[in-house]
């Protein structure tokens, strides 16, 4: 029986790719990629020429069985996403779950995940935190925000730039204008930036300055 490797890839800076990740990707029989065009650029940069197959949230339910069967037949497979660690607000959970259910060894390499540097650089308490990823866009959004209103731990969210102001405004409504937070964008890239302050200050800043790039919001928990 083969093995499934879960391989993190850089969230921006290609120099964050690990030696081990390159080695694994060069040795496996098949690479499952969220977007073969995006991953193709990464693989070409590191001279990785192994077979690649599209594996994203729209086809994952249909392709999991065939992937599991290939691993059972002895192939080694690597799972990568466009950026960061697969399964963290990215496709990957289903294939990992099915491999575990079928007794297949799953090995996840340590590596890049956008929320970790954002959390550490925020200056907010990080001994205990909760990762929320992307909030629901419609159904369940208000319910989730109400549930988080009494959360004491630091909270971490992903958001797109065009929805940032809407989300910050909703946070102010549910958590209060003076709640401390940070917005990190373009992590590990040339224009990386972290803006810190109260929700009121962040709303003012991003009303005047259009946000760009992938966003991580770190929000302080409620005071005791």
What is each residue range found by the language model?
Residues 56, 64-113:
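Glycine/small-residue-rich loop that forms an oxyanion/phosphate-binding "nest" at active or ligand-binding sites
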Residues 1-57:
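Glycine-rich, flexible N-terminal cofactor/catalytic loop recognition
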Residues 3-4, 73-78, 154:
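Loop/turn-to-beta-strand initiation segments
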Residues 25-31, 103-107, 154-155:
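Short active-site oxyanion
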Residues 154, 158-224:
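A contiguous loop/helix-start segment that scaffolds small-molecule binding in enzyme catalytic cores
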Residues 94-151:
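Class I SAM-dependent methyltransferase SAM-binding "motif I" and its flanking Rossmann-like core
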Residues 54-61, 134-136:
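Conserved helicase motor
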């Amino acid at each position: 029986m083969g093995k499934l490797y879960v391989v993190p890839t850089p969230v921006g800076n290609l120099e964050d790719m690990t030696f081990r990740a390159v080695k694994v990707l060069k040795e496996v029989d098949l690479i499952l990629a969220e977007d073969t065009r995006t991953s193709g650029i990464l693989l070409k940069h590191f001279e990785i020429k192994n077979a690649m197959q599209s594996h994203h949230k729209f086809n994952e339910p249909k392709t999991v069985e065939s992937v599991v069967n290939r691993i059972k037949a002895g192939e080694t497979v690597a799972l990568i996403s466009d950026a960061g660690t697969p399964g963290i607000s990215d496709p990957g959970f289903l294939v990992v779950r099915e491999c575990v259910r079928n007794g297949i060894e799953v090995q996840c390499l340590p590596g890049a995940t956008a929320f970790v540097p954002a959390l550490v650089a925020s200056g907010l308490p990080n001994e205990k935190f909760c990762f929320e990823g992307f909030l629901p866009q419609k159904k369940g959004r208000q319910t989730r925000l109400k549930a988080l209103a009494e959360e004491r731990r630091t909270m971490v969210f992903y958001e797109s730039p065009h929805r940032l102001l809407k989300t910050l405004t909703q946070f102010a409504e549910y958590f209060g204008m003076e709640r401390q937070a940070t917005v990190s964008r373009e992590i590990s890239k040339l224009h990386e930036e972290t803006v810190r302050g109260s929700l009121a200050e962040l709303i003012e800043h991003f009303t005047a300055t259009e946000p760009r790039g992938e966003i991580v919001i770190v929000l302080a928990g409620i005071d005791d």
